[in-house]
Design a protein with these regions (language model features):
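Short, Lys/Arg-rich, polar N-terminal cytosolic tail immediately upstream
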Residues: 1-11
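Short cytosolic juxtamembrane segments of multi-pass membrane proteins
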Residues: 7, 196, 277-286
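Short membrane-interfacial helix/loop motifs at transmembrane-helix boundaries
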Residues: 2-4, 25-63, 130-131, 231-238, ...
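Transmembrane helix boundary and interhelical loop/hinge segments in multi-pass membrane proteins
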Residues: 49-52, 129-130, 175-185, 194-196, ...
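Glycine/proline-centered hinge or cleavage motifs at structural transition points of membrane proteins
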Residues: 190-191, 204
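Membrane-water interface segments at the C-terminal ends of transmembrane alpha-helices
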Residues: 12-46, 63-146, 151, 156-176, ...
Length: 286
């Protein structure tokens, strides 16, 4: 029987390159070029000839502008942690399947199909000061005044959670379901408690998937825009960095300054991803 020739590592593979080429071109056209063009615009201030860092100096010298970074982090980080923990809890509990699993999963992922605008409108209708929840509580005599759950920090967190929980839940459910169940059974046969199995066996195996889910949810949370406008205070406590960029671009018509803010936003996301990747490497099982 003739042996099948194997390809040495590092040897050029034309077929593989042809398969990668469409994706590479897409990334270059849709991500790399816009970023480089935005970087170019940010270095060409409207009122200064030639290249300059004036836009970045203006941004970091104005507390009203650079404060949007911390506001955005204060929304993205807590939401990401809550989404990840709840998704992990449910996905870990559903990894073996149970009665009506498909029905429960469908209900949990339903918000994905609604879209950001429709979901925000639904939150306003249910959690708003004149929404169903407050009207029901007042009618039952449980409260005398409505809870203020929208047009503030809480409203934006509610929207972010409902948008991103289904995505994170599906990702973790698929990842956890792919872990060999015999590893868990073997640990239990050796006398390990359920908590020990989770902490010593399952958690190290889930760590790479948790890191990826955390990174993706964080990036989406950091880019919050419609929810911060519709359910928050876009000129106050929920004025995120994306809102600052929008205001400069479409209210002040200063595309150069808006590009600088967008670049700062991208660099913040990139720095966070680097930290997450480094932590993922440390947590990965050896």
């Amino acid at each position: 029987m003739r042996a099948v020739p194997t390809r040495e590592r590092g040897e050029f593979d034309l077929l593989a390159m042809l398969c990668i080429l469409p994706s590479l071109l897409y990334v270059l056209c849709m991500f790399v070029y816009p970023f480089l063009y935005g970087l170019y615009l940010s270095l060409r201030p409207t009122k200064i000839a030639g290249f300059s860092l004036a836009n970045y100096l203006t941004f970091f010298s104005d507390p009203y502008q650079y404060g949007t970074i911390w506001i955005t982090f204060s929304l993205a980080v807590p939401n990401t942690i809550v989404v990840l923990l709840l998704s992990l809890f449910l996905a870990y509990g559903m990894r073996r399947g149970f009665f009506m699993e498909r029905t429960v999963t469908t209900i949990l992922i339903l918000p994905i199909s609604l879209g950001v605008i429709l979901l925000s409108e639904g939150i306003l209708g249910f959690y708003g000061s004149q929404g169903w929840l407050n009207q029901a509580l007042i009618a039952l005599g449980l409260v005398s005044e409505p809870f203020i759950l929208t047009h503030n920090y809480i409203g934006v967190i509610l929207a972010l959670f409902m948008q991103q929980f289904p995505f994170c839940f599906l990702m973790l459910l698929g990842y956890i379901s792919g872990i060999d169940p015999s590893l868990e059974r073997s640990a239990r046969m050796l006398g390990a408690t359920p908590w020990t199995v989770f902490r010593r066996v399952m958690l190290p195996l889930m760590a790479p998937g948790l890191a990826i889910a955390f990174a993706l949810v964080f990036v989406m949370s950091f880019a919050v825009f419609p929810s911060a406008i519709m359910l928050g205070q876009p000129s106050g406590s929920t004025r995120t960095i994306s809102i600052a960029a929008y205001q400069q671009a479409f209210e002040q018509y200063d595309m150069s300054y808006a590009s600088a803010i967008a670049v700062v936003m991208g660099l913040c996301q990139f720095a966070a991803l680097i930290v997450i990747i480094l932590l993922r490497r440390r947590m990965a099982p050896r």
